[in-house]
Amino acid sequence: MAGPVPTLGLLAALVVCGSWGLNEEQRLIQHLFEEKGYNKELRPVARKEDIVDVALSLTLSNLISLKEVEETLTTNVWIDHAWIDSRLQWNANEFGNITVLRLPSDMVWLPEIVLENNNDGSFQISYACNVLVSDSGHVTWLPPAIFRSSCPISVTYFPFDWQNCSLKFSSLKYTAKEIRLSLKQEEEDNRSYPIEWIIIDPEGFTENGEWEIVHRAAKVNVDPSVPMDSTNHQDVTFYLIIRRKPLFYIINILVPCVLISFMINLVFYLPGDCGEKTSVAISVLLAQSVFLLLISKRLPATSMAIPLVGKFLLFGMVLVTMVVVICVIVLNIHFRTPSTHVLSEGVKKFFLETLPKLLHMSRPEEEDPGPRALIRRTSSLGYISKAEEYFSLKSRSDLMFEKQSERHGLARRLTTARKPPASSEQVQQELFNEMKPAVDGANFIVNHMRDQNSYNEEKDNWNQVARTVDRLCLFVVTPVMVVGTAWIFLQGVYNQPPPQPFPGDPFSYDEQDRRFI
């Protein structure tokens, strides 16, 4: 029986202590809000002309996304509010040494700080967490929030661009005569310094895969041209200068675009007879149009600037269109014939002699008649003389029925038939009359072959002119494509964020560069 009695006594003591602690906190709350008559609608000042100092700081936990089409920056942040409320002061010794009191945010006065440049119509902080109140009247409120802020996008150097996205906080309820916005201060070695940067905890920060943070400055802006009675007189702005990581766009957009655009040079290597020169050029043009359509869906519909990729695609499309026109002209030249066009001597000299030498084009040389051709020509004269002798000795009946008599078994003539003696003029006339049809036929064949060779040679000259134009265009288009591509994309490579957040201000607004007060 002795064992359970001490146990029950210990439990009773714990319950009494717990109830006493709860009673002290409850008594403190009653003292602050009921006995003192706390009113959360009134500013925590003794006189009307007094100003409440509100200090702000921002902790970035995640840069979620930047939607270029909507021009919206989505961030996950913690915004720290701090101010002095003299009505919430107490003596800790009178209330069980309670130095910190956690209260719902709807029980105390709030400065109503909102994100002025929000992009979703939600000005207020959605999650109202508790406030921390110390016995000295110092109030701290650290609510988390997911902000969707407006961020004007500059597409000039896409995808080698950087953006300056800011989060502008101000009070839409109180003017500069009622509250004074400032940056929160920290102490180090008995010296205080303002937090002039966005706080990032390396352990709690999630890095974005598309953007990297270059500068994260914080600054209080006061516009003296705006009267203090206006809510636009002052604000606290947190600047996020971010740079795009272009690797994704280089692999998926730039490299395919460049490769497809340079394929247009292969058109000048295709022979005119294949009939695919224009088809290849038009296919490249269609592919560039598809890429341009994809990029237009990625960027905001703005007429302020043209992105680098858009400039390159437009440059390539203009060049490809010119190549299509050149292909049509080259095909027209290639299929020209002597029956439709005449190749002038000036064009022949320029495109068949001068330009090929400059473009290092080689053409098979024409073969000169050699000694074998002369031997063949002299030997043919012997055949002709033998034929004349044969025709002069044979009678017409034998010439006409020689084979037929052999088929019927008739003996050949042992002696040659000779015509009665005639004058030499008659013999020559008869021989001429007999040989004239054959000679005329041979002359016709020779003239026809000569005309055909001349026709083919002229047609080959037109083909060579077309090849020369192709080679000339290849030597012109390729350097233009290379220089144009390098000039366009080097603009983006050298487009870097400024070394300091604000032009003309040498201060870096970084944790390592603190300005002590």
From Swiss-Prot:
Ion transport recorded as keyword: yes
InterPro entries reported for this sequence: Neur_chan_lig-bd, Neur_chan_lig-bd_sf, Neur_channel, Neuro-gated_channel_TM_sf, Neuro_actylchol_rec, Neurotrans-gated_channel_TM, Neurotransmitter_ion_chnl_CS, Nicotinic_acetylcholine_rcpt
Membrane topology classification: Multi-pass membrane protein
Protein's cellular compartments: Postsynaptic cell membrane; Cell membrane
Membrane-spanning segments: 246-270, 278-296, 312-333, 472-490
Alphabetical GO biological process terms: acetylcholine receptor signaling pathway; chemical synaptic transmission; membrane depolarization; monoatomic cation transport; monoatomic ion transmembrane transport; musculoskeletal movement; regulation of membrane potential; skeletal muscle contraction
Cystine pairs: C151-C165
Protein name: Acetylcholine receptor subunit delta
Lineage per the UniProt record: Eukaryota, Metazoa, Chordata, Craniata, Vertebrata
Annotated gene: Chrnd
